[in-house]
Regions:
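Membrane-interfacial amphipathic/re-entrant helices at transmembrane-helix boundaries
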Residues: 1-26, 53, 64-76, 102-106, ...
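Alpha-helical transmembrane segments within multi-pass membrane transporters and channels
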Residues: 64-114, 121, 259-264, 268, ...
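Short loop segments and helix-boundary regions at transmembrane helix junctions
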Residues: 34-42, 86-132, 174-181, 236-239, ...
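Transmembrane helix-bundle core of multi-pass membrane transporters
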Residues: 98-99, 107-177, 204-207, 270, ...
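Single transmembrane alpha-helix segments in multi-pass membrane proteins
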Residues: 8-57, 90, 94-106, 248-254
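Inter-helical junctions in multi-pass inner-membrane proteins, predominant
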Residues: 3-21, 128, 153, 174-179, ...
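Helix-loop-helix "hairpin" substructures at the membrane interface of multi-pass membrane proteins
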Residues: 18, 149-230, 254-259
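Membrane-embedded helix boundary and interhelical linker motif in transport proteins
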Residues: 35-38, 42-90, 150
């Protein structure tokens, strides 16, 4: 295989890895918007909290002498999901439920306030400096090689792909076949009608925040291990990129969030490789603008009809 093709293949691997985590975070944005028509701008901070919780659990277990990689990561996942889900429920209960019937600008201000509070809370309690995470998966496989370049897949990339696939599959099955999943779909179609039919809409809305937070926590654990460093400010840009992925795929559409995340991740990887890392954010947001010019509702979004 030619060196140019191997280099392109390597960037595709990197893009799918990054896009998978964007898709996980984007799920939270798209589910909340799909039901209550609001954007949870504190969602990125939940991702950040998930990465910190997993770090603390892994560090504590390693101090106790446990050094099995999969066991440490599994414990990190469980702890991060539980704590992040509690934060997701709290954000809905404190930041959204009291202002749900108010103007959207008020809810937006409330969400931004929650984001700033969580960011500064972690900064004050854990410090504002970068924290290095222990590397638990160091293996890699050579997919193809030439004289000067080899395309590889790392163990951590495989873990990210497998965990993302399992999480997406579990969410799809839950939404499609479970009783609460059907309630979520009913609320997404018509919240008022769902309430009239006896569905506890408050519980469903809280559940969407919890599910979104759990997905963000999974992404936090994965990206923390992939990059090896975290800080209290990683949630802002990750949240913005995931929001971009959700809008790109069609805000309110779960498959759209998955597709948007993958497209965005691949676009970032290719732009970093063939242009410069300085342009990756420019390319990401320019791609969003171009897609919305052609498809204003995103790739899989549906146009909304508002009654006046």
């Amino acid at each position: 295989m030619s060196e140019q093709f191997l280099y392109f293949l390597q960037q595709m691997f990197n893009g799918v890895t990054l896009g998978s985590t964007y898709a996980l975070i984007a799920i939270g944005y798209t589910m909340v918007y799909g039901i209550i028509g609001m954007i949870n701008f504190a969602h990125g901070e939940v991702y950040m909290i998930g990465s910190y919780v997993s770090f603390m659990i892994i560090a504590a277990l390693m101090m106790l002498g446990i050094d099995t990689g999969w066991l440490l990561v599994a414990a990190g996942f469980i702890g991060a999901i539980i704590i992040a889900s509690a934060y997701g429920w709290s954000i809905e209960r404190v930041g959204y439920r009291p202002v749900r019937s108010s103007k959207r600008l008020i809810a937006l201000i409330s969400a931004i306030g929650m984001s700033i509070f969580l960011q500064n809370f972690v900064s004050l309690t854990e410090g504002s400096r970068d924290v290095a995470l222990p590397s638990l998966f160091n293996g890699q496989w050579i997919v193809g090689h030439s004289d000067n370049f080899s395309a590889t897949i790392t163990t951590m990339q495989l873990v990210i792909w497998v965990v993302t696939f399992i999480a997406m599959l579990a969410l799809t099955l839950f939404i499609r076949y479970s009783r609460m999943g059907r309630a979520c779909r009913a609320c997404a179609e018509d919240l008022k009608m769902a309430s009239l039919l006896g569905i506890n809409t408050d519980r469903v809305i809280a559940l969407t925040f919890v599910i979104g937070a759990a997905m963000a926590a999974v992404a936090g654990v994965l990206l923390g291990q992939f990059y090896g460093v975290i800080n209290p400010y990683i949630g802002f840009m990750a949240g913005m990129k995931a929001f971009t992925a959700a809008v790109l795929g069609g805000i309110g559409s779960i498959p759209g969030a998955m597709i948007g995340g993958l497209i965005l991740g691949i676009a970032e990887a290719l732009s970093s490789a063939y242009l410069s890392t300085e342009y990756k954010d420019v390319v990401s947001f320019a791609l969003l603008i171009l897609v919305l010019l052609v498809m204003p509702t995103g790739i899989l979004g549906r146009p909304e009809v508002e009654k006046v």
